[in-house]
């Protein structure tokens, strides 16, 4: 590894260090740093939030003078411990090495391992026209022709994502299934259903069950739910991070992890004859922010809106005016962040994708109207204003010829748009088959027994945390579902009281559409189906994001669903119910 000097303080500056937090900027690089002094002990880090790269400022609410606050999302970092305190018990900040040299200057050092993509380097070779072509299908799905090989990214071509909350904005090309079947390999970045689409893969498996699919070796396996899905795929390859995977003499790829969500999120570098294509997909900080520069083509998400926050929240500050202003500000921050990332990495071509979804079900009209997305053209214009990067706003079926674009960006054949009259945006969605699957769970025998609640949350395994949650089953419009369950869960001791405990405790109310929550419970699915899918309405007191709770239910639930067969057998022997304290509304 190499050692890089990030900041050098003179002996006078060292002598003037104050107790507590000190902010510094390297004027030659424009980079910011934080140095914390506690008597003779010094700790240092980059002034960059681990979440989305925001700048820290002094936290005026911290009278002890140990914490800083991010200007993007109000995350807070205790610099004395290098642990984030909002959200509580979440992340740790990467520390820098502090050293004094022989001239009594203070140095902030960063130890950098070698970039894995620089191992076994290949110089770019000249490409023939038509040799490398990238065709956009929809959302995050790209079809790459790389010589005589074809590679597809993240195929979501039919059905919803996140239960019933997301639907495709763009109409995929009519030959999408043929394209998938002709692929030599498929890369699936992570387990979210707008990238890992079981309805799409079921269609593909009916024709090519042995198609090679590659995923990263994440803590939560991408295909953790494959057996339960019923999709017959027989050639799934889990590959280690940061190692070239050779496809043929000209083509290789490398999967990298996300720096914020390494347990589930990945990105990829594809290299053909020395020309790199970087796809950061949904990663918040892909590879911890260390990425190859000056690649031939970079693509990333851009739209925002992939969260239930703040649209699904109410009470306290969550007025419609506050939500609208927050969303507007957040989208602008995301645009600036993506534009700065592109400016820093200097790819030859940049393409915004992986954000083309819509909340099209009539019951989600409020979300659709409130959850505005970024315009890809606005991002591309911002990029072009600050750099010489070529930008491409893709339309379904449009094809980019890499050789032509690298040689002459003005070549009219560099990007071939779909034929005139091609349908670009979807105007109808086949809701019913997918809603029927969800509705089937509502009348399941499991929910005839109130003891399912204790069974489910015991299976989930989250406890010893001071949080009380009220779960309320609702209809389509988030009104209490007739005969539905309304119950409390105290996660400190995993009990199910009739009333909130007397002790001081954080409290959340989660109103969930009955078809989705019961489908999730029955099948042991992750709560992203609820939260990212806009299938809940939430209130919380105090207004704190409980990272441990949500992270557990969104990513750390057991890999196998609850054993409901055994549960029902026990119920037959123990009626009228194991969990007498739970009542129905």
UniProtKB/Swiss-Prot annotation:
GO MF annotation, one: CMP-N-acetylneuraminate monooxygenase activity
Pfam families recorded: Lactamase_B_3, Rieske
CDD domains: Rieske_CMP_Neu5Ac_hydrolase_N
Catalytic activity line of the entry: CMP-N-acetyl-beta-neuraminate + 2 Fe(II)-[cytochrome b5] + O2 + 2 H(+) = CMP-N-glycoloyl-beta-neuraminate + 2 Fe(III)-[cytochrome b5] + H2O
GO cellular component, one term: cytoplasm
BP GO annotations: CMP-N-acetylneuraminate metabolic process; N-acetylneuraminate metabolic process
Keywords: 2Fe-2S, Cytoplasm, Electron transport, Iron, Iron-sulfur, Metal-binding, Oxidoreductase, Transport
Cofactor or coenzyme needed: [2Fe-2S] cluster
Rieske domain location: 9-107
Enzyme class: oxidoreductase
Covalent S-S links between cysteines: none
Cofactor note as given: Binds 1 [2Fe-2S] cluster per subunit.
InterPro entries in the record: CMP-Neu5Ac_hydroxylase_Rieske (IPR037339), Cnh (IPR027033), RibonucZ/Hydroxyglut_hydro (IPR036866), Rieske_2Fe-2S (IPR017941), Rieske_2Fe-2S_sf (IPR036922)
Enzyme Commission no: 1.14.18.2
Pathway field: Amino-sugar metabolism; N-acetylneuraminate metabolism
Subcellular location: Cytoplasm
Principal subcellular localization: cytoplasm
Entry's family note: Belongs to the CMP-Neu5Ac hydroxylase family.
PANTHER family xref list: CYTIDINE MONOPHOSPHATE-N-ACETYLNEURAMINIC ACID HYDROXYLASE, INACTIVE CYTIDINE MONOPHOSPHATE-N-ACETYLNEURAMINIC ACID HYDROXYLASE
Protein name: Cytidine monophosphate-N-acetylneuraminic acid hydroxylase
Native species: Pongo pygmaeus
Taxonomic path: Eukaryota, Metazoa, Chordata, Craniata, Vertebrata
């Amino acid at each position: 590894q190499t050692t890089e000097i990030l900041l050098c303080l003179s002996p006078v500056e060292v002598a003037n260090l104050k107790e507590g937090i000190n902010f510094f900027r390297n004027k030659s690089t424009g980079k910011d740093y934080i140095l914390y002094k506690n008597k003779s002990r010094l700790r240092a880090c980059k002034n960059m939030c681990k979440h989305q790269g925001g700048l820290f400022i002094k936290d005026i609410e911290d009278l002890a003078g140990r914490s800083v606050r991010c200007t993007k999302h109000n995350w807070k970092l205790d610099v004395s411990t290098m642990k984030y305190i909002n959200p509580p018990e979440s992340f740790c900040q990467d520390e820098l090495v502090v050293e004094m040299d022989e001239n009594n200057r203070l140095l902030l050092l960063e130890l950098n391992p070698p970039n894995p993509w620089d191992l076994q380097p290949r110089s770019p070779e000249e490409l023939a026209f038509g040799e490398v072509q990238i065709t956009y299908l929809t959302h995050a799905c790209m079809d790459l022709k790389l010589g005589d090989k074809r590679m597809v990214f993240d195929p979501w071509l039919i059905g919803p994502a996140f239960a019933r909350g997301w639907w495709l904005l763009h109409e995929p090309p009519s030959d999408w299934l043929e394209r998938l079947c002709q692929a030599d390999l498929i890369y699936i970045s992570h387990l979210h259903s707008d990238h890992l689409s079981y309805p799409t893969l079921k269609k593909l498996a009916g024709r090519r069950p042995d198609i090679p699919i590659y995923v990263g070796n994440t803590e939560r396996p991408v295909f953790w739910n494959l057996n339960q899905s019923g999709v017959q795929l027989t050639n799934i390859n889990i590959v280690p991070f940061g190692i070239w995977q050779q496809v043929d003499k000209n083509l290789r790829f490398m999967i990298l992890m996300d720096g914020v969500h390494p347990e589930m999120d990945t990105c990829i570098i594809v290299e053909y004859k020395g020309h790199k294509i970087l796809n950061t997909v949904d990663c918040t900080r892909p590879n911890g922010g260390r990425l190859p520069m000056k690649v031939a083509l970079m693509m990333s998400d851009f739209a925002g809106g992939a969260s239930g926050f703040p649209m699904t929240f109410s009470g306290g500050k969550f007025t419609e005016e506050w939500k609208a202003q927050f969303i507007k500000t957040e989208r602008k921050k995301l645009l600036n962040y993506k534009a700065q990332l592109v400016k820093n990495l200097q790819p030859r071509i940049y393409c915004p994708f992986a954000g083309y979804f819509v909340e099209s079900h009539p019951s989600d009209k409020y979300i659709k109207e409130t959850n505005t997305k970024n315009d890809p053209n606005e991002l591309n214009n911002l990029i072009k204003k600050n750099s010489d990067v070529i930008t491409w706003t893709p339309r379904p079926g449009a094809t980019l010829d890499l050789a032509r674009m690298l040689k002459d960006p003005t070549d009219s054949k560099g990007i071939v748009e779909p034929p005139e009259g091609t349908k670009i945006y979807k105007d109808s969605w086949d809701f019913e088959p997918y809603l029927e699957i969800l509705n089937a769970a509502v009348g399941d025998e499991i929910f005839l027994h109130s003891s399912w609640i204790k069974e489910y949350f015991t299976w989930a395994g989250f406890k010893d945390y001071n949080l009380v949650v009220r779960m309320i089953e609702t209809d389509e419009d988030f009104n209490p579902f007739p005969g539905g369950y309304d119950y409390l869960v105290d996660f400190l001791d995993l009990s199910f009281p009739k009333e909130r405990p007397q002790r001081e405790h954080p409290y959340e109310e989660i109103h969930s559409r009955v078809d989705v929550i019961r489908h999730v419970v029955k099948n042991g699915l992750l709560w992203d189906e609820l939260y990212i899918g806009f299938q809940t309405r939430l209130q919380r007191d105090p207004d704190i994001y409980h990272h441990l709770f949500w992270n557990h239910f969104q990513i750390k639930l057991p890999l196998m669903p609850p054993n409901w067969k055994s549960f029902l057998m026990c119920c037959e022997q123990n009626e009228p119910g194991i969990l007498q304290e739970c009542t129905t509304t």
